[in-house]
Amino acid sequence: MAQQQQQQLQQQQQHHTSSINNNNNSILLLQQQQPQQQQQLDQLQQYNNNLYSQNYNMEEYERRKRREREKIERQQGIQIDDRETSLFGEPRRVTEGDAEITAALGEFFEARVYINNQTVGISRSAPGAGNPRLQPNMPPQGKSLGHSPSSASASAAAGPTSASATTALPGQQQQHYQQQQRPPTYVKQADNKPPYNGRGGYPGQPMKNDIPSSSGMAPPRGPPRSSSSNSNSSSATNNASSGGVPASTPLGPPLSTQMPNGREKSFLGPPAPALHNGTGGRFVPPAASKRPGVGQQPPPPEKDVNKIISDIANIFTVQPLTLIAATPHAPTRENYNLLAPNKQKYAMDIPSSPPSAEPSSLMTPLFAPIASPIAPLVTTPPQASQLPLGGATSGTILAGEALAPLHQLPPTPPKAASGVTSPGPGKPLKTEKNHSLEKQDSCLENDLELSESEDEQRKKEGRSAGNSSNSSESDSSESGSESSSKNDPQHHPNHQQHHHQLQQQQQQQQQQASMQQQQVLQQQQQHRPQPLTSNGAQNKKFRHEIIARGSNTITGLLSSSGFGSGGSVGPAGLNSSAAMGAGSGSGGTLSSGGSSSNKTPSPTESNKWNLSRFFHKPANQTNSENVSPGNVSMKVPGILPGGAQIIPESIDVTTAIVKNEKIHDDHMAMEDGEEEDDDEEQQLRYGGGLSVTPVAVKKEAIDAVSEMALGAIPKTQIKRESAEALLSARLSDSGTSASGSSSSSSSSSDSAVGGEVVPKLGLGEILQLPGVPAAITTVMRVQPTQSQKAPPSNSVTLTPILPLPTSPKQRQKKPRKKKAVTSAPILDSSDDDEPPPKHPGLDHTAVSVQTPPAADTVKKGRGRPRKQQQSGGSGNLSSASAGSSSQTKGPTLTAAKKPLAKTPLAMSRARKREHSSQSSSNGNTPTKKVATPQLVAAPLKPTSVTAGSSSSDEDSSSSAESSSKSSSSSSSSDDTETQNTNCRIVKLNKTGAVQKKALLGSGSSSPSSSGSEPEDQTTRSQVGSGQALAQQLPPYKQLPISQHSQHLSSSECSSSSGGCTAVCSSSSGEEDEGRREKERERKPKSDKNKISTLTRIFNPKEGGAKKQGQVVIVDLQEEQQQGKLDAAAQPPPPQAPPAAPAAIMAKPRMTPTQQQQLGAGLASPARTTTPHLTSLICKIDLSKLSRERIMRLKKLTPAQQNGHLTPKDQATNAVHVPNGYAGDTNPATKVKHEHPVKPEPELDAGYEAKFKPGNVKQEFQLKQERDRDRERERERERERDREREQPPGRRRKRSSSSSSSPYKEKKRKKEKADQLQIGKELLPVPVLLPSNNHERMPNHDRLSYDKLQLLHEDAAAVIGDVSAANGSPTKKMMVMSPLPPPPTVTVAPATCNEAVQTTPPSATTASATAPPVPATRLIYRSYFDRDVEHPSDDPRKNNQFLQEAISRKHAADLERDSFNQVTLYLEAVVYFLLTADAMERCSSEQATNTMYKDTLSLIKFISTKFRPYQQQSTTNIQHETHNKVAILSLRCQSLISLKLYKLRRKDCRAVINSLADFFRVGRGDIANGNTPSSISPSNSVGSQGSGSNTPPGRIVPPDIHNMLCKENEFLSYLNSAHELWDQADRLVRTGNHIDFIRELDHENGPLTLHSTMHEVFRYVQAGLKTLRDAVSHPTHQSQ
């Protein structure tokens, strides 16, 4: 039978030689290799007797029918199982790994879905389509699926990999893969619809990302050609994630040889010999593989494939900085990293094969480090090990199946038939397209690996690494880790660290039997030098594009001269494939990418290291959106949402924190070139991999439990983090965030801030980082956070945190400090720790650092996250920011506080915090602070300034509102205290004190509090924005929403933004109240003594707890009541806070980046204070204290409130500040004051160097003023208490006051006085802040050059402005933001000072300032204040903008996914606008006009892309996103039309004047002359008729006609501008997108018809980032 089948196959292939040239070669190879093939076929027959015989005996007609069926199925999102089934025949031998592989692949589906939705510029094919890249590399041996034994194995490998379902259904596939033609076998593939979309890259599947991925999808029908696989990086990524078996053809069957289905047609011949050569006959592919019936369809010509691949490669490789280009790659690579482990396992035989001589040399170093974590490989040692090809590449589950095909493929290269055919075209494609694909892979891979590896880690923790990094690690757990450690020396130390992490993971995995088995297989495979790397390292090195795919890495490595770019050894070495694989991949599911890179860093690969960098970087994040994945997102690590990764990360982060610092910085200034080499590896470890792998490794305490939790955690959460990281990275790359991906962006912005910047939460619960545009920063939206709320419970986010929402905030804070992007993974873990906070806003605050992941984490880990942190995994990530918060009890927070205090810089803080939190969360966590940990955590993360309030709010939603106010305020106070040297005062945010703060920091706070109540959200948003320098404008909205929440958020914000500020304002108000309480409540002496003792013990100044302890008294119930009371009482106070809102307003107006940087500068003091968080925190339940004082505090009069207005005043002020700009500004200022006052003594040298000089002076003055202010405040509080004895108010105030014992209240009063003085001394503080901003600026360099320049200019301006104590902070903000509110600045100076001061030295001062604040705080900044926004643009910048625009447009042209394409186009448009704007200054008017016109035509074309979606119901998430893109597009069109009119306004004026003269004079002859009736009736009838028919009128001279035409043109532009604007407004209202637009307005300043092109750029970029994050989150959820 085997012989007959082979003969039939050969005959059929010969018949089809005309259509399949490569098949002839493969047939020849088959003939030569028939003896071996027969053996293989015999084996194959055992698996695939019936179906194979049917498939191979199929005629052309049958094949065509089958192709049609497959196409239809693909269109339906169902991957055809035919080839996959046959492919499974061989892999099925690997029974041990089947279950594990299935579990892993099942997770991959989710990851693929995420990639499809999340990644931009990457099209996703069905696994087959993605595999095509690998497939082209694969010999097309099986004409159909497995015509020849080797083809069967290769196609089997490709099939399983291509079928996402294979991951989910490994067992089934093994049973059915013999029956290639049975698609039902892949019913699960429906789950892979997004990834499988590209499987058949035929244009008919526009929705599927795969098709769009390559401009030249080879077959229009479902299965993409090898070329389409090559061209479709996303599809390759998907395939890799599912299992990129096609990659198994390194030498590869020519790309064309592969069937459109992804099957290799005539390649069977070469594979069999390759099998014999490479495998040495270990595994004989089943004879069924010969059967031509299944996959003999001719693959598209190689020309098409090469062209597509080259085009894609050119587009993406040329633009490493392009966030879009880079972002897609990282996720794809992560997907491949997940698959890579299997590939490496199966690649073992390949190195031995002659064709893989080069590869094997490289491969041998690689050791197939990415041993798939699938135990089945062990079970299938003979064939699986023999088949290093597709099985390993295809994916964990597909490992067995893929092995045979891949193994066969390696022999094929020796034959040189397929090797010769495919390598030539493959290499060029590889060189060009590998980069682009690699980039996409890195982003996608990060996304996939984050979610999938997280899930896999959870699932496989017992078996193997389980994560993509785990899978890669598990495969290479021993040998792989060894190889990675060996290879690491070649690579950056990051890889070595990653190796350590991997080794740790491996150790954990080794504990598991399946893990051990996999390791054995891995070792065996590693001995076979197969170059499979979990990443797409092969892709970069491998000639074949398929190899470029991570899953195809084995074949690719073989094809590319044994680079083993599979992400294992060599490939990682060359590109940053290792970094990509290690960082991206490792960041994703595991540090599989990282380990892979560590394992695969072969010298040969080191040349291609650059490609990995690009992919690697976006992966880091995620992030951001999101780091992110590392892309996922710099903002927030993708894994955090699950929480599982977070726990491991804290340990890993700790180890790699030093390098992470660098990574964080790189992310902050995420320049693809430089950062990607070092950073990518680091990011791979930390950010790129979302530090998930490190988390898994380091969270050994969590180990199986935590990883299992990760497995339980929805991949949406994990991937979401990756996606976020990726998004933030993208945004950064695009210049919005200056980060490779959204996650990166958030993480980077956060990192930039270090502990220093206070992130702001926007209305949408977006965390605003001072240096990062709000949109970019806000990778995670409120909705994503909410959607992820449930996941957090699943996520490893420590469940212990649940009891104390505050603890998550600490984590958030840590990410802040960590903000140095790589902290994206850290952020994720911190988010996981944070999940206990229930408010999306809180999560967002944390998320803002790593935006999307944090949100996921927060939501996921509400209950569990703390446990995980306690377990030590997530605690490590957020240990710095949420060390104690990571543990619900907050012990880590206390430990984290010390590190925070120690690390002045955000990055150093992040690292130290991570280390300390790791240690503290693992062993240092004192459980004293149960409720406060979260509170402190929020403050700890200046980024999560609002996190403090939101965390407490999340804890008890409305009831927590009040408590969150006091507890979060106190915790934020603690944070500030830690940041500021002291702040050991137990700071209960009193309503009065908090309110002002809320105004100041309400912007950031709002998102965090959004979870609890709208009011809280608004308040917190204001606080956060104030902290982040009004990065988010939502504060104005938030202020009105919840006055009491404003109080909470304000205190939180002030404390978070500036520990001193929050402490001082709350301490002045609260101390006054506390004093009143002392006087009024007169708590029993026992209580007073206790409080006093506690305060002394934990008061740094008192020397307790080594001066690092803090006592946080939180009364959730009290605070809840207070929140309600404040809400009722806030109407009166709003007037006082307006000044702060005005200041905030100024900030919010600032460019997102500028705002964020300003926020960073202002917030940096907060972070500075954060380091001062005491390691010892005592949390006292206010319920145990008398509550009368709280009531009194509530009722404090505005005068008593001093710096903080009464809740009513705050509400009024907040309301008055529509955008909350003033509020934001004030909080930032407050933060400055706080930091100068308290944190400095305890600040690290670096931090002190930045802030201490001014702070020291301020401290002395503050100390002096404190005594005076304390006395004054005490008197005032007494009076106020007497006045405000009303029970409700008293209770609230009492909570704050009670929490702050009389002793604490005194200290708070002192701090208030200090802060007042600080306000007076604002000049030094602002100066310090500007310097901080400048320091952070480099972090934000990733932002568009335009933004960077603006930021730098703004920072300089801020420094200059610092001279003015009051006006300077606000002015800074104004300078920083394109829309700074100068009037606000003018009016805000006092307000800002107050904000910074947190409270004037005396209540009187506060009261006096408060009234002016409303007057001073103009909701909108002056229109004339932004004229200085862009003082100059240099021509080089224009070129850069133009290049960015062109690169994005080309990427969009090739993009198949509608959403990704539209977003890429719109990004290109805004870059074109920046180019045209620059041309206005240095080019001719005509050239500028032409540029705008062309841009307008382009955007009009783009608008046609989302019209179909606009008409559909907006309930559909996709339609909602398209509607939002349409809104942004309409706004751009409107402003472009207006610009075109303005450019020609002079001409228009002249024309109008001329026409007016013409019409006024009435000259012009009547059409028929003076005699309407023609000259004479005798004229010809014709003439008469014509004359009579001529309508009466005037003859218009040609010049007048021309002028009329011009006038029509000019006025048409003007009319279009207003009409399009109105259309956008209508769409906002009808589509219910008001919140989305309001959020963007708060973050970036409202977009108006007066907005400049730079403002349009920032606004649109922020909106696109937000949308990408939103798209990625649903994907995670669905997964």
UniProtKB/Swiss-Prot annotation:
It is found in: Nucleus. Has a role in transcriptional regulation. Acts in parallel with the Ras/MAPK and the PI3K/PKB pathways in the control of cell identity and cellular growth. Essential for regulation of the cytoskeleton and cell growth but not for cell proliferation or growth rate. Required specifically for the microtubule-based basal transport of lipid droplets. Plays a partially redundant function downstream of Raf in cell fate specification in the developing eye. Pair-rule protein that regulates embryonic cellularization, gastrulation and segmentation. It comes from Drosophila erecta. Belongs to the AF4 family. One of its GO terms (molecular function) is DNA binding. The modification Phosphoserine is found at S451, S453, S829, S830, S879, S881, S1368. The modification Phosphothreonine is found at T421, T1370. Residues 859-871 bind DNA. Residues 1-21, 55-78, 124-305, 406-539, 580-609, 733-755, 783-1172, 1197-1319, 1569-1594 are annotated as: Disordered. Residues 598-609, 783-796, 917-927, 1019-1030, 1198-1213 have a biased composition (Polar residues). This is AF4/FMR2 family member lilli. Residues 1130-1140 have a biased composition (Pro residues). Residues 492-501, 810-820 have a biased composition (Basic residues). Keywords: Developmental protein, DNA-binding, Nucleus, Pair-rule protein, Phosphoprotein, Transcription, Transcription regulation. Residues 69-78, 429-442, 1073-1090, 1234-1251, 1260-1288 have a biased composition (Basic and acidic residues). One of its GO terms (cellular component) is super elongation complex. InterPro entries: AF4/FMR2, AF4/FMR2_CHD. Residues 582-591 have a biased composition (Gly residues). Residues 444-455 have a biased composition (Acidic residues). GO terms for biological process: periodic partitioning by pair rule gene; regulation of cytoskeleton organization; regulation of DNA-templated transcription; regulation of lipid transport. The gene is lilli.
